Amino acid sequence: MNKNLRFTQMMIGISTMALSFGSIQTQVSAEETAPYNILQMKPMGTETSKDEIVHATKADETLNFEERLKIGDFSQRPTLVMKRDEIQLKQSYTLAELNKMPNSELIDTLSKISWNQITDLFQFNQDTKAFYQNKERMNVIINELGQRGRTFTKENSKGIETFVEVLRSAFYVGYYNNELSYLKERSFHDKCLPALKAIAKNRNFTLGTAEQDRVVTAYGKLIGNASSDTETVQYAVNVLKHYNDNLSTYVSDYAKGQAVYEIVKGIDYDIQSYLQDTNKQPNETMWYGKIDNFINEVNRIALVGNITNENSWLINNGIYYAGRLGKFHSNPNKGLEVITQAMNLYPRLSGAYFVAVEQMKTNYGGKDYSGNAVDLQKIREEGKQQYLPKTYTFDDGSIVFKTGDKVTEEKIKRLYWAAKEVKAQYHRVIGNDKALEPGNADDVLTIVIYNNPDEYQLNRQLYGYETNNGGIYIEEKGTFFTYERTPKQSIYSLEELFRHEFTHYLQGRYEVPGLFGSGEMYQNERLTWFQEGNAEFFAGSTRTNNVVPRKSMISGLSSDPASRYTVKQTLFSKYGSWDFYKYSFALQSYLYNHQFETFDKLQDLIRANDVKNYDSYRESLSNNTQLNAEYQAYMQQLIDNQDKYNVPKVTNDYLIQHAPKPLAEVKNEIVDVANIKDAKITKYESQFFNTFTVEGKYTGGTSKGESEDWKAMSKQVNQTLEQLSQKGWSGYKTVTAYFVNYRVNAANQFEYDIVFHGVATEEKEKTTTIVNMNGPYSGIVNEEIQFHSDGTKSENGKVISYLWNFGDGTTSTEANPTHVYGEKGTYTVELTVKDSRGKESKEQTKVTVKQDPQTSESYEEEKVLPFNTLVKGNLITPDQTDVYTFNVTDPKEVDISVVNEQNIGMTWVLYHESDMQNYVACGEDEGNVIKGKFAAKPGKYYLNVYKFDDKNGEYSLLVK
């Protein structure tokens, strides 16, 4: 029976690298041709670095959010806190070499080597086919695994990890290739059950030494690729219990966390696969009611309590798997009960909270244990407002950044200008700047950047995409997701990764027809080597020095010439062995610098969607011994001179304040220096500055052929940029340029269309629109709140439309609307106004909605509040509100601050005795401090400190 769920085999090249280890490059399992993407329940393979930017899967590109939730695995891997040492392996083996050995020699060899000494695990070729077609040999390996399971010790794992990886590779390759169809059958997977049980019955099967942890990890991984039964699941209970009982010690131990993760993931994966393959319900399976102890230990993980940086991944997994496995408990509502407890236990909008809500939506009909409906869409929108509150627009809205509040404006500006450097070099090389399919979502490029790796984990909940990576681009949405990082969190800077991913955007829009993963050109990973190496190559783009090799790429090339990729290996690389990124970069860098006509032809064939001739040309290049020799020599040259290279990044010239300069003058100077004809200038508006493009036609000298003409043109454009930079205006140091549409005229002269882009600093027309929302507001559930836009005006036109977004999914186009909220809480209200020139301006304010109005009885328990004295209080259900009073005798400024000790949903509002319906001040959140100042007039004031969710917490209050 196949572990094949809803989808036919997807493009393997569309990977979402499956491992999240604190952004540190770590290899902890055997390599595969396509890293396991949990969004499709295909066989599990290898795990990779979180540093890398990845492409989406076909599921990511085609399914809606709810469908992705149903088929996805949004578990979270433990975080590695130490960078591994590089291991230099003494000898490598191919499966062809292993296949020539008699069984006794094979077993002896496998017992002495590491799995990563076998170079072609998880790859399908004639050699791997021959190795895995031998059923007798497979049985020998399985039986030997059982023998070693009985005899491993605390100090010696007996090579169990290597035997397991060889078997996992078999099941993985068998899944994708009909020639090995017997390896797809569950009946054959079940042959591993005796070996698994032999391992588990060994008294050393527990968390402990590094060797023991390694065996436990292998046990979980093999179950995920092979199969389980109730007995193998029960054997795992003691491992989980041991981990839970020693959580305070083990939570910081990566190896033990990894072992527990693989155990739970592997068992869940096998059980969920069985449901899909058989179309059975949980209560119709062997596991129903027979694995309660295992589920109970998972539930313990879900309800650990206090979330820390060390245990957040663990808690999230506990909730996730408690929801999925709960239906197999003898009490089928146990899972719903646990995730409801988790939802109420953890902070609202935290990762744990989102995992609980998603499990309710995905597995329990969108209701909690008490039958209350949860509105996932509303919660998701609240999460986006909290984690991605900032929006920046560029180029008339064609580039949009949505970011966390700690991503600096300077970083956004740098990324914008980095995109322009990459774009200029990219269009030069491909010779085209027209979208292949205008009207797609990528007409507007959206870049979503979270504050840090931890908050990036929320992207799974907010947008529904994998986060075990350094970032992911979804072409179907025209959106790129990533996060800000520190040098300790990633070996690459955000700008470096952004340049890589921006190249993928350019590829999809200007070079490769069709959406990512669709069409014949994408099949069989034809473009894997090209697109990833191409992105690494163009990440080295500069403003005036073409595209240069990046030191970070060169350092990834092997120091051993015999270990470097050949041209053939590079051209036929597939996802799985991530070294190919570096080697494909090196090959494309070589072609760019020394065989541009070859580089150009490859791209022409791809853009023309000429699959037949692309295949033929790639095959021809792969067998070109001269090309391979020159490629090897080029890599050696890079390695020998790597200290001379760096990692290109935008200079501070882009960020300085440039003097105003009329655009007409800019155009004339560019036309004069560049010697172009038929020039036109276009201005574009961005949030921080405006930009321009100058387009024209350049006529060169006598044509010497396209390749030589291109080189001459590139040199000429670089010289033009340098000449412009020597002029007095600093804005010329922001100018990039590219040329497209090569042709030769009747006089045998080459011609190009040329485009310059840079900052525009002419004096701006005053276009300010003042949006006045007259907030913040407060009100009562189910009672009208009056909103006002008085004071809103346009300085250079008149306001012609209003759009209020009340933050609860409803809107109004009135200037001064009323609105009724159905639920208590704090809402963000946004007002968008448009003036007679079509310009839009926005502003936001807060509205606090309480459950019950304050009556005169509410103040019977008022507490007198002294000035300049710290007061402690708490809000514990059913106590929703604390009321304090203080008197002001003379006009003065009063400063109120409340420290929200447990970060519950709480705030404060202040009333004057003369008007108990309209407050005079309210708190604004600054971290966990709720602050406010106001000019007080004499009289008595009532300070209401209240909570608006079900959490309990303490606070400290100071009025001065």
Swiss-Prot record:
It is an enzyme of class 3 (hydrolase). GO terms for molecular function: metalloendopeptidase activity; zinc ion binding. Its EC number is 3.4.24.3. Keywords: Calcium, Hydrolase, Metal-binding, Metalloprotease, Protease, Secreted, Signal, Virulence, Zinc, Zymogen. Residues 768-849 form the PKD domain. PROSITE patterns: PKD (PS50093), ZINC_PROTEASE (PS00142). Residues 836-859 are annotated as: Disordered. SUPFAM superfamilies: Collagen-binding domain (SSF89260), PKD domain (SSF49299). Residues 93-365 are annotated as: Activator domain. The keyword Cell wall biogenesis/degradation does not apply. Residues 375-644 are annotated as: Catalytic subdomain. Gene3D superfamilies: 1.10.390.20, 2.60.120.380, 3.30.980.50, Collagenase ColT, N-terminal domain, Immunoglobulins. This is Collagenase ColA. Residues 1-30 form the signal peptide. Residues 846-857 have a biased composition (Polar residues). It comes from the Bacteria.
